[in-house]
């Protein structure tokens, strides 16, 4: 006895000591952390009990239940989840990996995150083990044991999942960062917005979804082995039959899924094809959203809708093959779980009947069924987790393939001091000795010795420090085997000089600039530059969806004095005065409502603000009227311009030769991609046939200081102020029933109820056998194996029926419901987007709209179906099992209402926060996607400026911001999972207590109840898993619903008049006192316009930049609404006509060309009305047949990357010629082409549209001198109107504009403007 006392004392002391240690460990130590190391994450500072029971998460739930959450209200993620913690490790491992080998990324991820991944093994292992029995003589001990087991299961299950989700968050952040960093290093020709966005929205998200049950791969196998061992103990040899059923089904499954060769071969291949179809549709949609103004202007919304819908239908058709296989896999997973007990009990009963041994009784039956339930869950989890892992591996492989694509290698040589070209290497070059200053006067050069591709005539032993760019014998093409874009280029540009590159369209001007920037590899020769960085402005200005000021300063800091200098130099000061928020006004995605000139000047201002030593400009003045162009040119590139004063080297590719005499060096490109002439203006003005053909012998306009203070006014920019609202800002109060009803309305109520009935039949087939076993075992207790065939056959019938019904439910959902929902929701989105007013796209972030078409549709297509059937089946199963529990023990019924009330308030409390978190996750992800798209569109600009590292940091900040709601949503789900499992533990303890302390039910009924408790616990756990997935997917439905509701349509009530097929018959256009604005709250852009365009006449609208020219056409096309007045065409008020119908009856050639996502043939003739010969003839007319033949002919895909801007515009002109309508609208259609191409387009329009009404906005006034009438606008008003020649010969405002276009100064312009506004003239 003393020994026992001593042992007991030691044991007690050890327990107390452990308790003290546990208490100290559980005590939070945040108050002990030094201030410099304090972290805002409460989880990181929480103790072990706090983490185990998620107490640290309660404050956020309380806050979310009381108020509306914002991202800034959320906890920060702890250090272990940030990409900073893993950047060096994963970057180093990825650099060392053989990225060309399959699954290289998988290996890198496993090696990097093995610690996080392994952290979930121990708690998961605690859930796995054989059940042990406790003496039923100690009732209270058994009750305590049940409490410990069930609470332990709840805590360990939640902890295991939480550890796993931390791994998912870390991998998600790393994958997105790797994709972005790789994208910034790709060649400009290989970057695809759709590819990278598909990876982020689809593959990365599916990777996370597939990893949620990753530990079930190994844990389920252990549970299967343990369950089979326990069954063998209970049922003996009869368990072999069940084993054969399970093994047979697994083998069948493996045969279907793994293609008998490799795991995931069939499923992975089908998924890959499906994802490629998604990428194709996504690419078309993003291109559509980016060209929305041109699409609306040309009345092409119905064509775009038809093309995009066809891509969506193709995607759905392809996905059916994947879904069919998935239906088979899921059904097979249920075969083993439902049929295994049948075969086991049948074998046991048959052996018992033949040998006369103990029949199947309640104790062995319900114990075995409990084990079978656990076995079935283990088999199902192993199968589903295997499919998920296959999906994850396939997605990782797609990411690896993207990361393995060839990176851009800068082919240039960067040297601070550039050696001059050695004349011995080129017989064309001979040495001379002139300075930079002497280059400006080359009149004495002997033209007979001049060679077009020689720099020796203008450079003789130039000092090394004075050279900025040297190109030697360079030839370049966009891809291997393709035609040379430029050939045999020899060129040197000195520091501080201005070089202009001119030539016809397609001659390689832009290509030469790309070579200088290192964006295009050269096949031969060398390119040497004095700086790796350059301020670059592309032909299509790149703007981001931030304020005007932030677009100008980029990633630099604000220098107020320099900023104001740049703004004034680019003539933006007057624009700022018209903005409601000044230069803090957000301009919208791609500056959708800005005129071309305003976009160009913003981009130019950004280049100037950067203060780089090298500036490269690609036709930045093309969208400006002559007066504005001259003012900006003088301020920037004139003798006193800020680039000249700063000694900046500038290379300007241009189609405008108005100021070419100011260039220090001129490069003339030929149509064959070679330099045909180069030298100073004085050299070439007589020697260059091309330069002479352009008529460049002209004076340069000088702008007086008084004129510089007055310039253009703003047009549509003023609308992008306070209207900028996130598309999801108001939908956090959605009730779930409203969302579910909306989904059911979409798929159809009949379709829905068929699905519910099938699921109910399946649940009945699963649950009723538990009660049937009671009848069977009670009959056996009365008489051994009584009516064995009867009980056994019916027992087998229910599972067979359940399997057949489940197959029907899956097929009904996956093939019918999903396809219908996919078509309907895409149609809702597309209709809403295409019918939205143009102003919507300037006030809404492009990432938010793109998110609807990418992530939201993907959630509905991929996540929602499996979550829906899982939630429906498990919810019905829970209800059925509660009924069975009550049937087994009537006393438990008293606890059910309390449990229901508890669950109701828990879900109410939970949903208030989780609903906000799921929407915040999407809201926080939208800027990340927008930044991603903007980075891809501005890739060349970002790299040229040297902003790659800073944009990577911006991406990192946006990613970390989006990770916060993403991770906390997972935490909220784990909190709910823990709470519900504790509720199940409570119910189980009550049932066990009743069973051990009362005798109100039979053993069989108690067995039914205990079995149902186990099933209820398993199903409740599954319900949490599927319901949280369904909750996220239904969030996508909610966002689509709100997008459709809150996106107003441009079509207004009363706009329902139908037009005859051949309308307009004559083409008479009449403006009657028209005033218009881009939005009800913005400044009017048109004021009291009245004029008439007679049938068959040609009328030009001109004026300075921002005077209202494009807005006049926008009013005619119903892109903006009238505040007063009316516009009629052939006597019909266009405000009564459906807008799309109106636009489709007019021919519009916008400033920015766009393509449909289709072949060249379909782009020219989308309705299939013309033969191949007719299409080729039209291409011949516009001079594009040879170009198109080289690109692959009419059946090649239209691609803006392989055609120059001018070539694209000629293709759009060919499309316009094929249309028979009576009215042609030209919106600065020739502003971005060279003079020869412009003259060609003018001649084609004059010939092909001679009997039609033409209304044209033009900056080059020389192209409209033969028009019947010209209307001059200023500040949205008509100040002059008459015949161009008549106005040109008189002291008119038009004459002053014409003189400015011809390079002559007109000092009285401003006074005349004021005079004309006060009293407009008409001639």
Swiss-Prot record:
One of its GO terms (molecular function) is ABC-type transporter activity. PROSITE patterns: ABC_TM1F, ABC_TRANSPORTER_1, ABC_TRANSPORTER_2. CDD domains: ABC_6TM_ABCC_D2, ABCC_MRP_domain1, ABCC_MRP_domain2. Keywords: ATP-binding, Cell membrane, Hydrolase, Membrane, Nucleotide-binding, Repeat, Transmembrane, Transmembrane helix, Transport. It is found in: Cell membrane. GO terms for cellular component: plasma membrane. Gene3D superfamilies: ABC transporter type 1, transmembrane domain (1.20.1560.10), P-loop containing nucleotide triphosphate hydrolases (3.40.50.300). SUPFAM superfamilies: ABC transporter transmembrane region, P-loop containing nucleoside triphosphate hydrolases. It is a multi-pass membrane protein. InterPro entries: AAA+_ATPase, ABC1_TM_dom, ABC1_TM_sf, ABC_transporter-like_ATP-bd, ABC_transporter-like_CS, ABC_transporter_C-like, ABCC_6TM_D2, P-loop_NTPase. Belongs to the ABC transporter superfamily. ABCC family. Conjugate transporter (TC 3.A.1.208) subfamily. This is ABC transporter gloK.
């Amino acid at each position: 006895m003393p020994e026992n006392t001593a042992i007991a004392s030691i044991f007690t002391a050890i327990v107390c000591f452990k308790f003290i240690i546990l208490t100290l460990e559980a005590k939070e130590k945040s108050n002990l952390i030094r201030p410099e190391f304090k972290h805002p994450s409460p989880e990181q500072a929480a103790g072990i009990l706090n983490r185990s029971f998620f107490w640290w998460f309660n404050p956020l739930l309380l806050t979310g239940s009381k108020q509306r959450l914002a991202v800034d209200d959320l906890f920060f993620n702890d250090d272990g989840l940030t990409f900073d913690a893993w950047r060096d490790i994963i970057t180093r491992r990825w650099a060392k990996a053989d990225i060309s080998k399959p699954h290289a990324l998988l290996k890198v991820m496993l090696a990097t995150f093995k610690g996080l991944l392994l952290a979930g093994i121990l708690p998961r292992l605690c859930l796995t083990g054989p059940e042990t029995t406790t003496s039923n003589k100690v009732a209270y001990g058994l009750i305590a044991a049940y409490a410990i087991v069930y609470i332990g299961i709840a805590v360990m299950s939640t902890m295991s999942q939480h550890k796993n989700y931390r791994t998912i968050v870390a991998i998600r952040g790393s994958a997105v960062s790797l994709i972005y960093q790789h994208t910034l290093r790709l060649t400009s020709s290989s970057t695809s917005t759709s590819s990278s966005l598909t990876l982020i929205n689809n593959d990365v998200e599916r990777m996370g979804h597939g990893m949620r049950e990753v530990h079930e791969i190994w844990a389920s196998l252990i549970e299967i082995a343990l369950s089979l061992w326990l069954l063998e103990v209970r049922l003996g040899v009869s368990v072999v039959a069940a084993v054969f059923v399970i093994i047979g089904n697994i083998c069948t499954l493996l045969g279907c899924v793994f293609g008998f060769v490799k795991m995931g071969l069939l499923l992975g291949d089908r998924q890959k094809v499906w994802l490629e179809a998604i990428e194709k549709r996504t690419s078309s949609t993003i291109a559509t959203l980016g060209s929305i103004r041109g699409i609306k202007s040309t009345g092409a919304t119905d064509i775009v809708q038809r093309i995009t819908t066809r891509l969506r239908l193709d995607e759905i058709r392809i996905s059916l093959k994947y879904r069919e296989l998935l239906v088979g896999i899921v059904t097979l997973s249920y075969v083993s779980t439902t049929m295994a007990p049948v075969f086991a009990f049948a074998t046991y009963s048959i052996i018992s009947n033949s040998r006369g041994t103990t029949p199947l009784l309640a104790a062995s039956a319900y114990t075995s069924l409990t084990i079978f339930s656990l076995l079935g869950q283990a088999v199902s989890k192993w199968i589903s987790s295997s499919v998920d892992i296959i999906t994850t591996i396939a997605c990782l492989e797609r990411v690896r393939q993207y990361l393995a694509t060839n990176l851009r290698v800068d082919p240039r040589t960067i040297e601070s001091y550039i050696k001059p070209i050695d004349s011995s290497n080129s017989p064309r070059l001979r040495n001379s000795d002139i300075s930079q200053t002497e280059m400006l006067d080359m009149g004495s050069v002997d033209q007979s010795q001049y060679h077009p591709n020689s720099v020796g005539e203008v450079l003789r032993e130039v000092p090394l420090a004075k050279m900025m760019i040297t190109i030697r014998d360079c030839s370049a093409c966009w891809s291997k085997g393709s035609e040379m874009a430029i050939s045999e280029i020899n060129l040197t540009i000195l520091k501080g000089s201005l070089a202009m590159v001119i030539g016809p369209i397609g001659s390689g001007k832009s290509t030469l600039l790309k070579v200088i920037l290192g964006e295009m590899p050269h096949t031969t020769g060398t390119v040497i530059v004095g700086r790796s960085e350059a301020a670059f402005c592309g032909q299509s200005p790149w703007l981001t969806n931030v304020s005007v000021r932030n677009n100008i300063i980029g990633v630099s800091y604000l220098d107020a004095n320099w900023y104001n200098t740049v703004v004034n130099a680019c003539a933006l000061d007057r624009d700022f005065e018209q903005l409601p928020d000044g230069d803090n006004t957000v301009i919208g995605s791609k500056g959708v409502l800005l005129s071309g000139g305003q976009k160009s000047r913003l981009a130019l201002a950004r280049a100037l603000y950067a203060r780089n030593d090298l500036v490269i400009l690609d036709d930045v003045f093309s969208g400006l009227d002559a007066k504005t162009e001259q003012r900006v040119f003088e301020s920037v590139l004139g003798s006193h311009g800020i680039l000249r004063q700063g000694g900046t080297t500038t290379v300007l590719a241009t189609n405008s030769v108005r100021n070419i005499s100011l260039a220090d060096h001129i490069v003339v490109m030929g149509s064959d991609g070679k330099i045909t002439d180069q030298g100073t203006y004085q050299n070439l003005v007589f020697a260059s046939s091309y330069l002479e053909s352009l008529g460049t012998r002209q004076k340069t306009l000088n702008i007086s200081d008084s004129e510089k203070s007055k310039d253009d006014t703003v047009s549509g920019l003023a609308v992008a102020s306070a209207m900028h609202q996130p598309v999801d800002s108001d939908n956090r109060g959605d009730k779930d029933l409203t969302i579910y009803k909306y989904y059911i309305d979409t798929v159809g109520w009949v379709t829905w109820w068929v699905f519910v009935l099938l699921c109910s039949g399946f649940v009945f087939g699963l649950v009723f056998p538990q009660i049937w076993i009671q009848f069977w075992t009670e009959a056996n207790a009365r008489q051994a194996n009584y009516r064995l065939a009867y009980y056994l056959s019916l027992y087998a019938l229910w599972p067979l029926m359940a399997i057949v019904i489940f197959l029907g439910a899956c097929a009904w959902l996956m093939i019918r419901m999903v396809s219908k929902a996919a078509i309907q929701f895409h149609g809702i989105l597309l209709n809403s987007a295409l019918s939205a007013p143009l102003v919507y796209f300037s006030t809404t972030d492009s990432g938010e709209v793109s998110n609807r078409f990418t992530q939201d549709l993907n959630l509905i297509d991929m996540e929602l179906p499996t979550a829906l059937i899982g939630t429906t089946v498990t919810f019905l199963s829970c209800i059925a099992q509660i009924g069975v529990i009550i049937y087994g023990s009537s006393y438990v019924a008293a606890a059910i209402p309390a449990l229901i009330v508890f669950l109701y308030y828990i879900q109410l409390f939970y949903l208030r926060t989780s609903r906000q978190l799921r929407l915040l996750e999407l809201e926080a992800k939208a800027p990340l996607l927008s930044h991603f798209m903007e980075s891809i569109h501005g890739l060349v600009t970002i790299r040229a400026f040297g902003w790659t590292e800073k944009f990577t940091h911006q991406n990192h900040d946006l990613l970390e911001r989006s990770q916060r709601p993403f991770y906390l949503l997972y935490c909220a789900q784990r909190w709910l999972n823990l709470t519900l499992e504790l509720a199940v533990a409570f119910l189980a303890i009550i049932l066990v207590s009743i069973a051990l302390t009362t005798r109100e039910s039979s053993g069989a009924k108690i067995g039914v109840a205990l079995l149902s408790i186990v099933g209820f616990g398993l199903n409740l756990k599954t319900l949490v898993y599927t319901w949280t997935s369904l909750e996220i997917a239904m969030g996508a439905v909610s966002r689509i619903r709100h997008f459709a509701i809150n996106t107003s349509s441009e079509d207004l009530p009363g706009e329902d008049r139908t037009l005859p097929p051949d309308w307009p018959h004559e083409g008479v256009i009449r403006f009657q006192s028209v005033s218009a604005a881009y939005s009800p709250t913005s400044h009017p852009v048109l004021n009291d316009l009245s004029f008439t365009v007679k049938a068959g006449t040609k009328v030009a609208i001109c004026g300075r930049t921002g005077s209202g020219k494009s807005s006049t056409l926008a009013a005619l096309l119903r892109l903006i609404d009238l505040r007063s007045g009316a516009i009629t065409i052939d006597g019909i008020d266009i405000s009564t006509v459906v807008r799309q119908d109106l636009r489709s009856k007019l021919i519009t050639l916008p400033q920015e060309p766009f393509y449909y996502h289709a072949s060249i043939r379909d782009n020219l003739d989308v309705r299939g009305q013309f033969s191949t010969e007719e299409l080729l003839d039209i291409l011949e007319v516009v001079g594009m047949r040879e170009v198109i033949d080289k690109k692959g002919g009419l059946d090649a895909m239209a691609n803006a990357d392989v055609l120059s801007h001018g070539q694209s515009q000629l293709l759009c002109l060919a499309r316009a010629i094929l249309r028979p309508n009576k009215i042609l609208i030209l919106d600065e259609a020739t502003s971005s082409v060279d003079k020869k191409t412009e003259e060609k387009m003018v001649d084609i329009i004059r010939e092909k549209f001679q009997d039609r009404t033409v209304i044209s906005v033009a900056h080059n006034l020389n192209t409209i001198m033969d028009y019947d009438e010209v209307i001059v606008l200023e500040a949205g008003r008509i100040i002059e109107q008459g015949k161009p020649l008549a106005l040109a010969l008189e002291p008119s405002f038009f004459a002053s504009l014409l003189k400015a276009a011809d390079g002559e100064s007109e000092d009285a312009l401003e006074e005349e403007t004021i005079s004309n506004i006060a009293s407009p003239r008409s001639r």
